[in-house]
């Protein structure tokens, strides 16, 4: 089923993602578990569906620190999650020095895109922090909270859903 805003239903997007990456590893866990964690955190924070789906697919093309075995084409990803979500995924995957790039907005993204990237990577780091006890990661999450608080008044109301 194709929806009006050039994307498939949420359920179809999730099912396709899961079937594509069923056995993919990500560190000591499955890639699906991490990405579903990111998606769930974004949902709990009340993020729009486009952002949640971008969070689910956030590293399907590979990143500086992760290279998936399964390869999806941009065309296929766009077909499922839509143009805006795919653009966020593509941007996220291509970022070098991701945290500095996003926090300092080194690529001069417009306010909306920067805020979306802040949310996606905040959820990404939150999911990782649940299995790692890393003081640097906790400090980085605090920086993201500060950046999100200044760009999104809604964040102040939702950030306590998940404690660091």
Model-identified regions with their sequence ranges:
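Active-site helical microenvironments for divalent-metal-assisted chemistry
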Residues: 2-164
